[in-house]
């Protein structure tokens, strides 16, 4: 063997083997600020600095006015605000069922997030007192989401809907989540899929990612305790919420399936934790760096 050929093989073989040592996917992890709702506005400097120091790069707000006030601080820390959970009656129009909220025109709310530089306008939840008793309510709600999504699209925002567990409860042989799947405009409405609530309702997050292929723009990450019962209420005992990687959900498989579903942004949201929410966020972030 010539010296030249020997050198070629010595240098090329490690390169040929490199694909076998595939790098972990590049994945930017964010925080849903609902996790730190109890102290955020009282000590925002400390909380946001800690979130940034942990390594989080993206933020999702849990309310428009508070988030907009915090955006300069968030930007100064090198993080980017991507999405915000907005007032449900902006979309549904039933302000009388939300006594603690001041009515605001939908167009005004859209403009506020557009002006603030966000990409997503996200409907987070339909409170129990506002849910109709039959499936026609969900058909009507889907139509109203489509309308809001059209206005968002014209303004340069993406409309999204965040699921919980109640959408998976069967009624009249059909489920609200199936109505949303079939009735929401595929081009205008993205799903913000919460893997915890999908699983709490007895469904497989991976199968749901496949069913909603190309339509899941955002993913909420939190883990579930072993032996947690199937239920369709959000009244879940705090102990059933676990940090990512500390429960029974198959996060390596979920994260592998996410890109094909259309996921662009990943947010850790810890609704309940027995300790310091910031410690909880660090635990989840550290685990996510390993998968």
Model-derived features: positions:
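Acidic/histidine-rich catalytic cores of soluble enzymes
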Residues: 153-248
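Acidic (Asp/Glu)-rich catalytic clusters
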Residues: 24, 49-53, 67-83, 107-118, ...
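Active-site beta-loop-alpha junctions enriched in small/polar residues
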Residues: 34-36, 62-64, 86-89, 126-128, ...
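Short, acidic/polar
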Residues: 39-50, 101-112, 202-208, 251
């Amino acid at each position: 063997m010539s010296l030249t050929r020997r050198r070629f093989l010595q240098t090329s073989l490690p390169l040929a083997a490199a694909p076998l040592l595939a790098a972990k996917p590049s994945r930017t992890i964010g925080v849903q600020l609902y996790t730190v709702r109890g102290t955020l506005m009282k000590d925002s400097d400390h909380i946001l600095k800690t979130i940034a120091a942990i390594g989080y790069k993206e933020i999702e707000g849990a309310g428009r006015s508070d988030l907009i006030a915090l955006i300069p601080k968030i930007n100064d820390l090198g993080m980017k605000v991507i999405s915000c959970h907005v007032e449900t009656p902006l979309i549904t129009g039933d302000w009388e069922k939300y006594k603690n909220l001041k009515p605001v025109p939908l167009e005004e709310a859209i403009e506020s997030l557009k002006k603030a530089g966000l990409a997503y306008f996200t409907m987070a939840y339909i409170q129990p007192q506002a849910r109709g008793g039959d499936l026609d309510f969900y058909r009507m709600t889907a139509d109203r989401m489509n309308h809001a999504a059209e206005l968002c699209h014209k303004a340069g925002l993406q409309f999204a809907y965040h699921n919980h567990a109640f959408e998976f409860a069967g009624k009249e042989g059909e489920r609200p989540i199936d109505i949303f799947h079939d009735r929401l405009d595929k081009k205008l409405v993205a799903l913000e899929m919460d893997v915890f609530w999908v699983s709490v309702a007895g469904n497989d997050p991976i199968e749901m990612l496949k069913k909603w292929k190309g339509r899941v723009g955002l993913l909420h990450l939190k883990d579930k305790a072993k032996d947690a019962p199937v239920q369709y209420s959000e009244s879940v005992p705090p102990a059933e919420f676990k940090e990512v990687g500390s429960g029974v959900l198959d996060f390596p498989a979920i994260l592998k399936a996410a890109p094909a579903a259309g996921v662009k942004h990943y947010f850790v949201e810890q609704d309940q934790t027995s300790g310091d929410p910031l410690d909880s966020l660090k635990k989840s972030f550290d685990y996510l760096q390993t998968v």
